[in-house]
Swiss-Prot record:
Protein name: Crossover junction endodeoxyribonuclease RuvC
Catalytic reaction list: Endonucleolytic cleavage at a junction such as a reciprocal single-stranded crossover between two homologous DNA duplexes (Holliday junction)
Source organism of the structure: Erwinia tasmaniensis (strain DSM 17950 / CFBP 7177 / CIP 109463 / NCPPB 4357 / Et1/99)
Gene3D superfamilies: Ribonuclease H-like superfamily/Ribonuclease H
Record: residues binding Mg(2+) 2: 67
Length: 173
């Protein structure tokens, strides 16, 4: 059994989703958005850090999964997104959580089956996979999709990591 916190970072709205994985079964534990209404970026980053820290304290996840930065046409937006990611990652690292990153295309491919899926398709599949009564908010759905992706891909990541570790020690299995 493992609890996974997924984060969809944003400088104004950061989505979060928490699920429990027991074998192949996924259980919804909670989701929502950290909304920053203040105008200056440092204050928004502080709110993101505090919000993610509070969520970690509340749910006690074992794993932290976050969306990777993508290349944006607007450099200023990309920088702000990177800073929001940094605030969330520092909150996780401060509580000794391992951090995993997934590209948006990889998340959509894993959850919907199409790397170019629309937000509404992600929301629908998250609702279906977690047996929710309604579609979650878009940012929360993205965060839940990131957590689901971690569940599906983490076994491969672990196996690859162990294989590299064993090879580095000169042992083969």
């Amino acid at each position: 059994m493992a609890i996974i916190l997924g984060i969809d970072p944003g400088s104004r709205i950061t989505g979060y989703g928490v699920i429990r994985q027991t074998g192949r079964q996924l259980t919804y534990l909670g989701s929502g958005c950290i909304r920053t209404s203040v105008t200056d970026l440092p204050s928004r980053l502080k709110l993101i850090y505090a919000g993610v820290s509070e969520i970690i304290t509340q749910f006690q996840p074992e794993y932290f999964a976050i969306e990777q930065v993508f290349m944006a046409k607007n450099a200023d937006s990309a920088l702000k997104l990177g800073q929001a990611r940094g605030a969330a990652i520092v909150a996780a690292v401060n509580q000794d959580l391992p951090v995993f990153e997934y590209a948006a295309r990889q998340v959509k491919q894993t959850v919907v089956g199409i790397g170019s899926a629309e937000k509404s398709q992600v929301q629908h599949m998250v609702r279906t996979l977690l047996k929710l009564p309604a579609n979650p908010q878009a940012d929360a759905a993205d965060a839940l999709a990131i957590a689901i992706t971690h569940c599906h891909l983490s076994q491969n990541v672990t196996r690859l990591g162990e294989g590299n570790l064993n090879l580095a020690r000169g042992r083969l299995r």
